[in-house]
Design a protein with these regions (language model features):
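Conserved hydrophobic beta-strand signature of PAS-family and PAS-like sensory domains
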Residues: 35-39, 106
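PAS and related sensory helical modules
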Residues: 39, 46-67, 74-79
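PAS-family sensory domains
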Residues: 1-3, 32, 85-86, 96-104, 117, 121-132
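PAS/LOV and related PAS-like sensory modules
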Residues: 2-34, 47
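Terminal output helix/cap of sensory domains in signal transduction proteins
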Residues: 66, 72-96
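PAS and PAS-like sensory/regulatory domains
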Residues: 25, 93-95, 102-111
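Short loop/turn elements at sensory-signaling interfaces that couple input to output
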Residues: 110-125
């Protein structure tokens, strides 16, 4: 599954879903190309956003990376991620940004991302997020 290109496909997505369901924090995967559509998000991501399930999360965010971020933060975060990936041999990035939960509450998250090329989807980001509001 791992190598110079990540073999992300329907079979590996089922493995990722199983692993993701047991992770202690938020984990999601999205396409690097616009509209930055999500390919996967675990239950912990839904909970960070105050959503009960995938359907609520899709309704809230449009199931895109842009839809996950506070509108005022998107451009700066997007540019920062692109700059970090361009400079990083490991294709890693870090960002802090605001989100708007389903109940309207604004929260801060930290985001550790990794850019990977895949055969099935082209460039993707795998991302871990956690709510850091109480630490700010």
């Amino acid at each position: 599954m791992f190598g110079s290109k990540f073999q992300l496909n329907e079979q590996s997505i089922s493995v990722i879903q199983e692993i993701g369901s047991h992770m202690p924090g938020g984990f999601f995967i999205y396409k690097a190309e616009e509209p930055e559509e999500l390919l996967y998000a675990n239950q912990a991501v839904f909970e960070i956003f105050g959503c009960a399930d995938l359907e609520e999360f899709k309704e809230l965010t449009g199931y895109t990376f842009r839809g996950m971020l506070h509108p005022e933060d998107y451009q700066a975060v997007h540019e920062s991620i692109n700059q970090q990936i361009a400079k990083s041999k490991e294709k890693m990035d870090y960002a802090e940004y605001r989100i708007i939960r389903k109940d309207g509450a604004v929260r801060w998250v930290d985001d550790y991302g990794h850019y990977v090329e895949t055969d099935a989807y082209g460039g993707i980001y795998t991302v871990f997020i956690s709510d850091i509001t109480e630490k700010r």
